[in-house]
């Protein structure tokens, strides 16, 4: 397992970090490399796309260093705004509204969900499970719900119990096309449906 940690500073003080874990899973065909990310920022330094951009940068470096490896992003997202951040930048991020998940994605997700306890299947390609709940105030929870969008509505439909610690299991194949699509959409401020 590799564990890059990216720290963000402002005037010599740490204001946030993104911990990116890369786990190697052996399968009958070939090894899979599963990337996950956990980020946190001080309140005044949020909403600047640092989490996604730093993850894309690390992943591009890994992809260039190991071009033949199957690399996937799999994470249980515990907030609707975080789901929106990822789903709005790539059409290859699943699950998503009105788009069935490809079979190879479901197979990888099946491997990962077997590593968690109390996984609930809420539709054909939607899985949730209990996660460690980030510290949030009631005001923050209300604000998370007030930002309506197609992606947030999808998240809320399938994970209305996120505020008690349920996380939506999400997946994205990290091939070069997906990474470039996400990077361009972030840099141009463009969102996908």
Language model feature labels by segment:
Residues 31-43, 56, 75-76:
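Conserved acetyl-CoA binding element of GNAT-fold acetyltransferases
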Residues 7, 13-23, 35, 40:
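Conserved beta-strand in the GNAT
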Residues 4, 35, 58-61:
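Short, hydrophobic/aromatic alpha-helical segments in well-folded domains
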Residues 1-10, 14-15, 26, 63-193:
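Terminal substrate-recognition subdomain of acyl/acetyltransferases
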Residues 40-47, 140:
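Short histidine-centered catalytic/ligand-binding loop motif
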Residues 46-61:
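Conserved acetyl-CoA-binding loop-helix of GNAT-fold acetyltransferases
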Residues 21, 42, 58-65:
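Mid-sequence acidic-hydrophobic segments that form the walls
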Residues 25-31:
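A short, polar/charged loop-to-alpha-helix boundary motif
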């Amino acid at each position: 397992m590799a564990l890059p940690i990216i720290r963000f500073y402002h005037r010599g003080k740490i204001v946030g970090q993104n911990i990116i874990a890369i786990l190697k899973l052996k399968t009958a065909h070939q090894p899979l490399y599963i990337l996950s990310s956990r980020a946190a920022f001080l309140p005044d330094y949020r909403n600047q796309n640092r989490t996604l951009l730093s993850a894309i940068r690390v992943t591009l470096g890994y992809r260039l260093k190991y071009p033949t490896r199957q690399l996937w992003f799999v994470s249980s997202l515990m907030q609707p705004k975080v789901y929106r951040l990822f789903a709005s930048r790539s059409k290859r991020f699943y699950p998503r509204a009105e788009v069935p998940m490809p079979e190879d994605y479901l197979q990888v997700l099946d491997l990962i969900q077997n590593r968690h306890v109390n996984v609930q299947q809420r539709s054909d390609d939607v899985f949730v499970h209990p996660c460690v709940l980030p510290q949030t105030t009631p005001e923050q929870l209300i604000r998370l719900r007030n930002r309506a969008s197609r992606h947030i509505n999808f998240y809320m439909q399938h994970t209305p119990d996120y505020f008690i610690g349920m996380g939506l299991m999400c997946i994205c194949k990290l091939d070069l096309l997906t990474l470039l699509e996400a990077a361009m959409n972030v840099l141009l401020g463009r969102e996908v449906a």
